[in-house]
Curated annotation (Swiss-Prot):
Pfam families: Oxidored_q3. This is NAD(P)H-quinone oxidoreductase subunit 6, chloroplastic. The lineage of its organism: Eukaryota, Viridiplantae, Streptophyta, Embryophyta, Tracheophyta. InterPro entries: NAD(P)H-Q_Oxidoreduct_6, NADH_UbQ/plastoQ_OxRdtase_su6, Nuo/plastoQ_OxRdtase_6_NuoJ. Belongs to the complex I subunit 6 family. It catalyses: a plastoquinone + NADH + (n+1) H(+)(in) = a plastoquinol + NAD(+) + n H(+)(out); a plastoquinone + NADPH + (n+1) H(+)(in) = a plastoquinol + NADP(+) + n H(+)(out). One of its GO terms (cellular component) is chloroplast thylakoid membrane. The gene is ndhG.
Amino acid sequence: MDLPAPIHDILLVSLGSGLIVGGLGVVLLTNPIYSAFSLGLVLVCISLFYIPSNSYFVAAAQLLIYVGAINVLILFAVMFMNGSEYYNYFHFWTVGDGFTSLVCTSIFFSLIATIPNTSWYGIIWTTRSNQIIEQDLTSNVQQIGIHLSTDFYLPFELISIILLVSLVGAIAMARRE
């Protein structure tokens, strides 16, 4: 999407703030339904990040798969859970919670200190991407596959990490019962 620079910056800042607010909502809200809705906000913001980079198909696929299917499945699972038993196990600030919050805040502040000082323009993400893209790709599916494995590799890896963490959290909640 060819947007003027100020509008593009405002869009990215608003999507980034939506990601931060949604992520904090997932972690800090005690009601699991509100946490699932916050996860939906995070997934919507991630899918909307693809629109300024002219990847409309990827954005639509993210919305359909992650928000439309996975988040609805998480909401159904949370709603079928017995809420009263869940809150009996909930204690404020155990030793593990304190240690986890200390580790997470240290990682957060180290990333804040590292990211602005890193020169991202000299990094070569893949070595063969230019050779592959120079070939005559006739099919849109081939072009999407090449872009997903080269240009958009990092966002899909981040989504897989988010899904892995949510799966581990669901298993940990299920093992308590």
